[in-house]
A protein has these predicted regions:
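Short alpha-helix boundary/capping motifs
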Residues: 1, 120-121, 147-156
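N-terminal beta1-alpha1-beta2 submodule of the flavodoxin-like/Rossmannoid cofactor-binding fold
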Residues: 1-80, 84-96, 154-178
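Phosphate-coordination loops involved in phosphoryl transfer and adenosine-cofactor binding
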Residues: 4, 103-104
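Amphipathic alpha-helical protein-protein interaction surfaces
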Residues: 16, 98-101, 115, 135
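Mobile beta-alpha loop/short-helix "lid" or hinge segments that flank ligand
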Residues: 36-47, 99, 131-151
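A glycine- and small-aliphatic-rich helix-loop capping segment at beta-alpha/alpha-beta transitions
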Residues: 94-99, 126-130
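Short, glycine-/small-residue-rich phosphate/pyrophosphate-handling segment
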Residues: 105-144, 158
């Protein structure tokens, strides 16, 4: 069996304990065999400044770029805000434009929101612009995410099965790469 390579999970929500974060925490619980690192606080990243992209890059930006660069793949789980991706996630991606950290990097993404369609489309466009490798089977749109949680806080079975299938398949795909 191929050893599990490190996969970075980025939570795109501006809200602590968001539905997307809860969803990915449950994935972590059910997948202890997968080598994950979760980055769930985009609020610590300074606002994008083109003057600082190469020289005097802020420490937090260097750190997240290193996480991305050193990971075999990245999973982004995010809501949609006003038909777009959250500003903090867009900020992170803007900090990566002048680098090659996403070039040829396998990326999976889950958009969990009330609707999510436009944010999902926008994230795909941005990831392709960054040179990420995004496979159709490694994308999932979860509409009406609030209604996908049981009273005990767990994700309902049908939705969770789809998420787990995406994550498991993505991990196998990433682990098979040289």
């Amino acid at each position: 069996m191929t050893a599990s390579k490190k996969i970075l999970i980025i939570i795109g929500s501006a809200t602590k304990n968001s539905n997307n974060q809860k969803l990915m925490e449950q994935v972590l619980e059910k997948s202890p065999h997968i080598n994950f690192h979760m980055y769930d606080d985009l609020s610590v990243l300074p606002h994008f400044d083109t003057a600082l992209t190469d020289a005097d890059t802020p420490e937090e930006i260097v750190k997240i770029r290193d996480y991305i660069d050193q990971s075999a793949g990245v999973i982004i789980s995010t809501p949609e805000y006003i038909f777009s991706i959250p500003g903090r996630l867009k900020n992170l991606l803007e900090w990566c434009v002048s680098t090659n950290v996403f070039s040829d990097k396998p990326v999976a993404f889950i958009t969990g929101s009330a609707s999510g369609e436009k944010g999902h489309e926008e994230l795909l466009l941005i990831l392709k612009t960054l040179g990420a490798v995004v496979n159709d089977k490694h994308q999932l749109l979860i509409k009406a995410i609030k209604g996908k949680f049981e009273p005990d806080g767990s994700v309902e079975n049908n939705t969770f099965a789809k998420v787990l299938e995406l994550v498991t398949d993505f991990e196998k795909s990433v682990s098979s790469l040289k």
